[in-house]
């Protein structure tokens, strides 16, 4: 378990209730160990909240949508922090989740299996 900013706990809880469409769609596929591993949603890690986290594989999945277009530096800093903890980060576009879920799941499963 990783330490996290306690102020993020309530925000993460609220995010789970109000997730965007792509997060909800991907969560429907990831929950209940459908890919053979357990994921949690909106997981605080350090000063960040990961969209999805698999403790067993030390894997974060982030969905990047239009709101991420101008956040390259923030995402890079966040990815470096996760890497410093030994956590792998997969970034998936919002568009791919909505339009190509089967290939998204194949790609996630491939990465889960190789970690």
List the predicted regions and their residue ranges:
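A short, acidic/glycine-rich surface segment
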Residues: 38-39, 68
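Basic, amphipathic alpha-helical patches used to engage nucleic acids or provide basic targeting signals
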Residues: 15-19, 46-111
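Charged, terminal alpha-helix-loop-beta segments
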Residues: 42
């Amino acid at each position: 378990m990783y330490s996290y900013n306690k102020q993020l706990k309530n925000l993460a809880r609220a995010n789970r209730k109000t997730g965007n469409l792509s997060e909800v769609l991907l969560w429907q596929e990831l929950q209940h160990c459908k890919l053979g591993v357990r994921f949690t949603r909106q997981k605080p890690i350090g000063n960040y909240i990961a969209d999805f986290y698999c403790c067993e594989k030390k894997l974060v999945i982030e969905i990047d949508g239009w709101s991420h277009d101008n956040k390259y530096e923030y995402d890079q800093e966040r990815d470096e922090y996760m890497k410093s903890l030994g956590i792998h980060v997969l970034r998936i576009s919002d568009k791919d989740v909505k339009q190509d879920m089967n290939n998204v799941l194949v790609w996630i499963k491939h990465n889960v299996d190789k970690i």
